[in-house]
């Protein structure tokens, strides 16, 4: 429980104490850069490391065949981008300056400068920018996400906004990093948050009336009410 699960603070020191540890100088004089190492122990550092991946010349080039990434490859189809309706420029499935993993479908939504994990779904008219979406995240129609980290399988309701009003996000109980990155945990039920906000908005605007009955004449039932059957 006392561990931060951090390489520098916990993992490497613990291994040095109980095992024989050897250092390897990851440096190749024939390469233009030293080997990649980056501390991602904070939300802001993790966010910056991911945003670097989508830059034109990232420090860690995932597409460098001379330095392959050995990892599990899920058995999923390639990403798909659908809807490019003429005359409706907003409904165009597109991803720009982004990394999109297998199984993801951008269906009439727009993704900019973001990293999308496997099996993400971005629905029509939604806009995702400068964000990291983990596996299985579902983004509803007209939703807007900016400078956020969304954990696995979170469902973003239609029209929901994240990252556009930090005070509102903070009031929702979301974690916000010192750099202003909004983080949504996989346990968050955003549908309940959306429903609560919609109800509060309707009440403040007088759009919902209290369900009570009023009779101006005790002898005559009001229109729309049901009188008791005495037969």
Question: Which residues make up each language-model segment?
Answer:
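Left-handed beta-helix
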Residues: 1-231
């Amino acid at each position: 429980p006392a561990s931060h699960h951090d390489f520098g603070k916990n993992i490497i020191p613990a291994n040095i104490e109980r095992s024989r540890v050897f250092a390897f100088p990851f440096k190749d004089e024939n390469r233009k850069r030293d080997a990649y190492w980056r501390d991602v122990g904070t939300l802001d550092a993790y966010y910056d490391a991911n945003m670097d991946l989508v830059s034109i010349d990232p420090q860690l080039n995932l597409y460098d065949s001379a330095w392959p990434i050995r990892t599990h490859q899920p058995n999923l189809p390639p990403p798909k981008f659908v809807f490019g309706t003429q005359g409706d420029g907003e409904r165009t499935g597109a991803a720009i300056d982004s990394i999109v993993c297998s199984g993801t479908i951008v269906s009439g939504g727009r993704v900019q400068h973001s990293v999308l994990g496997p099996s993400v779904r971005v629905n029509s008219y939604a806009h995702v920018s400068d964000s990291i979406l983990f596996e299985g995240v579902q983004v509803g129609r007209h939703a807007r996400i900016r400078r956020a980290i969304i954990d696995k399988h979170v469902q973003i309701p239609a029209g929901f906004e994240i990252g556009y009003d930090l005070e509102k996000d903070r009031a929702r109980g979301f974690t916000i990093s010192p750099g202003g990155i909004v983080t949504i945990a996989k346990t968050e039920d955003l549908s309940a948050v959306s429903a609560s906000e919609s109800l509060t908005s309707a009440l403040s605007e007088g759009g919902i009336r209290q369900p009570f009955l009023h009779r101006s004449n005790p002898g005559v039932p009001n229109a729309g009410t049901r009188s008791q059957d005495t037969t």
